[in-house]
């Protein structure tokens, strides 16, 4: 497991906004800073759990998403928000955690 980013929900505008209409959210690029901070503003009709839309989450890259989900409280089932990436969210101690698997692990994991 490798740290990827922290996603911080906000209702305010932020620098470098990227609209993602298919996901019903606006984000910043977490790769444009050394700490992986990603701002996230969810659109009114975004179909995500309240926990994900209101509480910051930490995201980790995993080699095997299905194995990482065993025994976890899955709150967003595995899905593919972009080409080459599968993600799921779990709840751990009241906080959302994003698990990410790149289809081609050499692309991101080192």
Residue ranges and their predicted role:
Residues 1-32, 36-48, 73-110:
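Vicinal oxygen chelate
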Residues 51-80:
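Mid-chain, well-packed structural core segment of small domains
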């Amino acid at each position: 497991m490798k740290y990827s980013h922290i996603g911080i929900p906000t209702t305010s505008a932020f620098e470098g906004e990227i609209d993602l209409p298919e996901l019903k959210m606006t984000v910043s690029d977490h790769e444009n800073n050394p700490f992986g901070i990603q701002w996230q503003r969810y659109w009114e009709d975004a179909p995500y759990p309240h926990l994900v839309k209101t509480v910051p989450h930490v995201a980790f890259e995993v080699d095997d998403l299905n194995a990482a989900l065993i025994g976890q409280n899955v709150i967003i089932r595995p899905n593919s928000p972009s080409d080459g990436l599968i993600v799921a969210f779990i709840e751990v101690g009241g906080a959302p955690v994003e698990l990410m698997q790149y289809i081609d692990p050499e692309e991101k994991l080192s």
